[in-house]
């Protein structure tokens, strides 16, 4: 159940239809598609808080930063109250997680519920 998720933190997430699904459909890697399997298809105002992290737009895979930026923009357009986007300058798809961990940690600290 998607409503049970406490927070979303995609690291360089592919938010259009995944490249493997597109390959199975006979599409090329640079042919963008959005269907029901794509996270972009499911953007809504009332989902969990989301921290979107991408590497440098010039170093990421196949326009991944632009996907992340569009994902973020759609959350803002539907009125989502807690969506954040970070672009990590100088980091590519392979090394961006290292720079993302402090952001992840801070996001969790800010959003976790205190259990007594």
Question: For the regions a protein language model found, what residue spans apply to each?
Answer:
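Short, proline-enriched alpha-helix->beta-strand connector loops that line the catalytic pocket
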Residues: 3-6, 44-50, 78-82
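Primarily recognizes the serine-hydrolase "nucleophile elbow" in alpha/beta-hydrolase
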Residues: 1-35, 39
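C-terminal catalytic histidine-bearing segment of alpha/beta-hydrolase fold enzymes
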Residues: 53, 65, 69-116
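Active-site-proximal flexible loops/turns
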Residues: 19, 45, 96-100
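Solvent-exposed loop/turn segments at secondary-structure junctions
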Residues: 14-17, 56-60, 90-94
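Surface-exposed acidic, glycine-flexible loop patches that form ligand/cofactor-binding
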Residues: 1-2, 40-44, 112-116
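Short amphipathic alpha-helix initiation/capping segments at coil-to-helix junctions
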Residues: 32, 61-64
């Amino acid at each position: 159940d998607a409503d049970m998720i406490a927070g979303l933190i995609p690291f360089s997430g592919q938010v259009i239809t995944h490249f493997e699904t597109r390959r199975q459909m006979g599409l090329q890697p640079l042919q963008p598609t959005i269907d029901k399997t794509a996270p972009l298809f499911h953007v809504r105002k009332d989902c969990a808080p989301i921290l979107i992290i991408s590497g440098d737009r010039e170093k990421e895979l196949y326009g991944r930063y632009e996907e992340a930026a569009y994902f973020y923009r759609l959350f803002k357009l539907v009125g989502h109250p807690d969506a954040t986007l970070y672009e990590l300058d100088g980091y590519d798809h392979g090394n961006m997680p290292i720079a993302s961990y402090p952001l992840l940690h801070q996001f969790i600290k800010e959003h976790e519920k205190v259990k007594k």
